[in-house]
Amino acid sequence: MVHLGPKKPQARKGSMADVPKELMQQIENFEKIFTVPTETLQAVTKHFISELEKGLSKKGGNIPMIPGWVMDFPTGKESGDFLAIDLGGTNLRVVLVKLGGDRTFDTTQSKYRLPDAMRTTQNPDELWEFIADSLKAFIDEQFPQGISEPIPLGFTFSFPASQNKINEGILQRWTKGFDIPNIENHDVVPMLQKQITKRNIPIEVVALINDTTGTLVASYYTDPETKMGVIFGTGVNGAYYDVCSDIEKLQGKLSDDIPPSAPMAINCEYGSFDNEHVVLPRTKYDITIDEESPRPGQQTFEKMSSGYYLGEILRLALMDMYKQGFIFKNQDLSKFDKPFVMDTSYPARIEEDPFENLEDTDDLFQNEFGINTTVQERKLIRRLSELIGARAARLSVCGIAAICQKRGYKTGHIAADGSVYNRYPGFKEKAANALKDIYGWTQTSLDDYPIKIVPAEDGSGAGAAVIAALAQKRIAEGKSVGIIGA
């Protein structure tokens, strides 16, 4: 999702002994502003819990806490063929999912890269046409003889969308760099279904889900110890099962066939945590990113911890050092002085540079930006990359700790997905150890931590399929799938 390549061996750390005093001073300054101590993590978690509760109240809060209308736990016995499409930050994924009915599934998939310009196209139809065309290409490839029976489709839509029932999604606001007009505050399901129908594809969108909810449900399908689904990728988010009686904003809106004790999957959308800037330790670089973003004042937590922004935080800090005369002296930085010219693959590659003199980093700056670097400058760049990556890992688990504390979970599995979790060097270990710091666990091995972050199942693909299966079952049994009258 954020262009992270295959893993390389863990890098060897060079000595800082030869770094000049003025650069060491800058490194120390960066360590002060980017290091997140345990007491800060605990304060962030405490505030997070209160914001989660506000989001479930009738009045609402910064964190949307969107009911996902998944009102059953998967049994693992769900079976059948389903299609899933996953619209995330960078790619459109189309998946054929075969649920085995024995806590197993098989998937066949294709990815279609979203053209960068499509994120901000002024023609709202263009996005849905692209998705429908990709879906048709996939169907033609997988079913050359055609389809005899309509196939149910689960649509993973990884943006804040409110739902009054499982097969609708009203976009609240664009995130992840998207800003397409005339879609916000509208139901996206009929927009997509219209383009599918126009192409005579025998498919019905039966469930719209968020990728994080999909991660939760797919992982629960194979592992009933799952307590949360989380995404560490282009965006950052968490989903979990709450209890209907604890969701104040749903009181009086549910059918009689939904008991107060019924579970309800909640898509938190907690990238918007602390939009009021009460507790998160923002730096001047975070403030610049926010002020120059399409939506200033929104998605504060995401802008500090998600993959979409890590490279830009690094670039801004290096530009600051350049303007102060500390690095890249007497060089042309015109190629480098462009917002988001560094995606998250850059700090990742710098962190895993295996050479003591950081030759890969030297090549990276020369080849991509025409910048010559000294060994000492590269050591600053490397340390800064480590600090930014570690801060993201540590802050990102505050949402996990908050939900586990709110729900009273002492043990369990947190199913994690996303390119940053899967491929950013050291992220898994740093995230796990931040949880350890918040809780004060004494165990020394990650495998022994009471709450473990584990790799998710195929979240958005299989998750969309399992949710479509659960929705179909409810409909077949005549049960409610949304708010009364929706």
UniProtKB/Swiss-Prot annotation:
Pathway: Carbohydrate metabolism; hexose metabolism; Carbohydrate degradation; glycolysis; D-glyceraldehyde 3-phosphate and glycerone phosphate from D-glucose: step 1/4. Keywords: Allosteric enzyme, ATP-binding, Glycolysis, Kinase, Nucleotide-binding, Phosphoprotein, Transferase. Subject to allosteric control. Substrate inhibition by ATP. Residues 21-469 form the Hexokinase domain. Residues 75-209 are annotated as: Hexokinase small subdomain. Coiled coil: none annotated. ATP binds at residues 86-91, 111, 307-308, 344-348, 419-423. GO terms for molecular function: ATP binding; D-glucose binding; fructokinase activity; glucokinase activity; hexokinase activity; mannokinase activity. Belongs to the hexokinase family. Catalyzes the phosphorylation of hexose, such as D-glucose and D-fructose, to hexose 6-phosphate (D-glucose 6-phosphate and D-fructose 6-phosphate, respectively). Mediates the initial step of glycolysis by catalyzing phosphorylation of D-glucose to D-glucose 6-phosphate. This is Hexokinase-2. It comes from Saccharomyces cerevisiae (strain ATCC 204508 / S288c). The gene is HXK2.
